């Protein structure tokens, strides 16, 4: 896919667009317009994927769409809140600015912030690496009944 790649280690599709926020910022307007347009295109790709899956499989296949904000490992005590605000900013951008609602019968949307935690961190994971001032989009199939 142009916008997503499958991460074999973590078993999930992950956004490929390189987006990062300035230090301490969470508003989508702090991301360059060109990157916001790419994010919108990725959102449209998600929407098309979900529509196709719904038409093809009906209720038998469900997905979990996670918009995860992250923060750099700089010791700031508000990193969890900041990372959540980054994810929420993208979700609102899709819904309000672009009228793109990714909630469907076959998809649950979660908006979360992992602060300085999470499995897919940019390395080295230190205070000077601002690449973790970003968000990730994960698309996961939901399993059936677990016995």
Please tell me what each predicted stretch does:
Residues 7-45, 71-77:
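Short, solvent-exposed beta-strand/turn patches at coil↔beta or beta↔helix junctions
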């Amino acid at each position: 896919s142009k916008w997503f790649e499958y991460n074999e280690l973590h078993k999930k599709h992950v956004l490929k667009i390189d987006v990062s926020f300035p230090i301490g910022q969470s508003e989508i307007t702090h991301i360059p317009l060109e990157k916001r347009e790419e994010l919108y295109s990725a959102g449209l790709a998600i929407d098309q994927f979900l529509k196709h899956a719904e038409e093809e499989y009906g209720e038998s296949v469900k997905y979990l769409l996670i918009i995860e904000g992250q923060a750099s490992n700089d010791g700031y005590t508000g990193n969890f809140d900041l990372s959540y605000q980054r994810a929420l900013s993208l979700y609102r951008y899709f819904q309000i600015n672009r009228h793109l609602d990714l909630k469907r019968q076959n998809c649950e949307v979660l908006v979360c912030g992992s602060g300085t935690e999470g499995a897919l961190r940019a390395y080295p994971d230190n205070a000077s690496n601002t690449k973790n001032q970003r968000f990730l989009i994960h698309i996961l199939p939901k399993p059936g009944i677990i016995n």
